Amino acid sequence: EELIDEMKEKRGVTQDTELTADDLKELAEQFKAEYKEKIGSDFPSDPKEQLMGAVKAVFRSWDNPRANVYRRMNEIPYSWGTAVNVQMMAFGNMGDDCGTGVAFTRSPSTGEKKLFGEFLTNAQGEDVVAGIRTPMPISQMAEKFPEAFKQFQEVCNLLESHYHDMQDMEFTVENGKLYMLQTRNGKRTPAAALK
């Protein structure tokens, strides 16, 4: 992130999407140089090697101090281990028919059975929560991506029915097509939990 922020400052822009192709090429070279400095070897050019490196990094993270403290605090046995899901990348930042968002199947404040969340067009997931741009309410997704929104509503109903609990979800729309990235039981107020 620091290298990206430095490049944006150097170019006098505030958003990643304002960087040119040449800026991104320059950034890629900077990332490769930083990788070599920290790891001691060149960044692998083979995609399979890159993927396996990422998978191994997740498994190694199981033993980092923060993870150990978290497991102790939440009484999670070390023997459970961790898993790695590998899935195709969905790009929410390829144009105006793309986007990303986070949403709950219900209001986390009141428990009302109504979608609650935010989304951004032409953005990646972290952009929604980073505060770089102002997200739109999830209700406006119906206007921007009507087919994807209809499918999203169906998926939300299916997930809540399956898990018997309010869901907190992350999603991406790429070229008008919906991709569900993650779901988990949502946190809410005690009053909302009663609904």
Regions found by a protein language model. Give the residues of each.
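Nucleotide/phosphate-binding sheet-loop regions of phosphoryl- and nucleotidyl-transfer enzymes
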Residues: 1-195
